[in-house]
Each structure stands twice: as structure tokens, then as C-alpha cells.
């Protein structure tokens, strides 16, 4: 359980350092995702859903974010 909490804490810290990584013409989806997560608390399922929706809207998800989630075993393959 402590390992999972540590992973969440690490990803939370990582998210706080992120800049704009998924630019679309109208908005930066991952900035919106980041604000949403920091407001709601970190939840891997919410993050995966947000990334999936961002991809559906044509956003480019930065490989650094996907790589960090993979290392923390939080990435759900879809």
C-alpha cells in the first residue's frame, strides 16, 4: 500500500512540474487535465480517461507523461 501511495505522490509532484504538452488549436488539453487532477486529487483512472479523451480530440500526449505513468504502473493501455 505504501508503494502505491509513494507512486501517486511521485506522479503528483511530476504533474505539478508539467508545462503545456498537448497543444491543439483551441486549448492545451494536458494543462486542463493537470488542473482537473490537482483539483480533484490524483486518480490514475481519471488521468487515463482524460488522456484518452484528449487523444480523441486530436491532442498530442507528450511521451514524457506516458513514460512516467508507465514507470509508476499507472498507464492503462487502450
From Swiss-Prot:
Keywords: Early protein
Protein name: Probable protein E5
Native source organism of the sequence: Human papillomavirus type 41
